[in-house]
Every structure is written in C-alpha cells, then in structure tokens.
Amino acid sequence: MDVVWLYGSRAKGTEQPNSDFDLAVAFHSFPDDDWELRLQPELLAQSWSDQLGLADGIISVVDINHIPIQLAMGIVLKGETITVKNTLRLIREEHRITSMWELDHLHHRRHYG
C-alpha cells in the first residue's frame, strides 16, 4: 500500500460506537487476475479484522482506483490521509481524481445544464 485514507463517519467525527472504519487504499501492486484484483480490498479488510480481533464488517476497504469518481473526490476532500508511504503517489492520486472529477463535472454541465 502506498496511501491509506480514512473516510466516512470516523473521519467526520460523527461515528457511533458501532460504526465501521471506512478506508480507501492506493495499492502498491496489482494482481494480474481480474478476480484477484476485485478481491484485493476485501482480503485486506479481512486480514486487518483478523489481526485486530474485530468482527467481520467493522473494517471496510475500497481501492481508490476502482470506485466511482464522486466517492473518490469525497475521500480526497473530506477524508483523512492516515498512511503515506509514497508522497508522489499521494499527489498523483489527488491530481488524477481531481482532474477526472472536473472533466466529469464539465461534461455534465455542458450537456445537462
């Protein structure tokens, strides 16, 4: 993992005692197999839950590169960066997400008012 963000209620400070931990990850390596790529965040969440002795579903992990751009933009703007192993990757992800969001926003504005 190069970057990890905390988002959702725990990042906003509105969590309840039973709230989950929503985490977005910029992975360092990517499996070649599509199925393994899709499972990568879920397997990481399960591994962390097992290591910490937490119930299933308490940790939720998404791959920042494979989520809707609106969610990614919300994570970048309102989430907290909690781990940065590669600062350049953080900057690139923030730039990529912001650029994609701007293109999407301009497209919708141009075509739908």
Give a label for each model feature.
Residues 2-3, 12-17, 30, 35-113:
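Catalytic core of pol beta-like nucleotidyltransferases
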